[in-house]
Amino acid sequence: MLAVKNYKFWFCTGSQDLYGDECLANVAAHSKEIVAKLNESGKLPFEVVWKPTLITNELIRKTFNEANTDDECAGVIVWCHTFSPAKSWILGLKELRKPLLHLHTQYNEEIPYDSIDMDFMNENQAAHGDREWGHIVTRMGIERKVVVGHWSDPVVQEKQPWLLRLLPPPRPHPLSYQA
């Protein structure tokens, strides 16, 4: 009999404090909603765990080092909800030793053209933040899986079984019979 660990994947959202507390509260709420919906979909092999919004290089580095030492954390999923300066990620990315997935998505599936304003534009810059983040990761030569599309789309959710391929092989249970 094989023992399978109860792995978890951390969902880390990038932003910055430039946009203020209200925007950051919305970013956190949107991230929590995405995590809940991904877990409810039943399409992912393991639980996705929400982590507080990463807004500074110190917090990014601390979070990634915590992921490195957490035996249940099998990998990190990153999404940049707003513009998140790429230079803020460099130290954390250099030290990250877990598999990495870049979820390149937007919170809103549709752009509200009738009501769009600068607050909406500032809060929903994933297209900008994700591209800059992807650029720095590429420049650093860090391997990662990139999934592009709206997070609620079943096709996007089904692309995430890459998580299984990155896990270490299961070990036999110490009490199992081996012939």
Residue ranges of model-derived segments:
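Metallocofactor- and cofactor-centric catalytic cores in central/energy metabolism, strongly enriched
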Residues: M1-A179
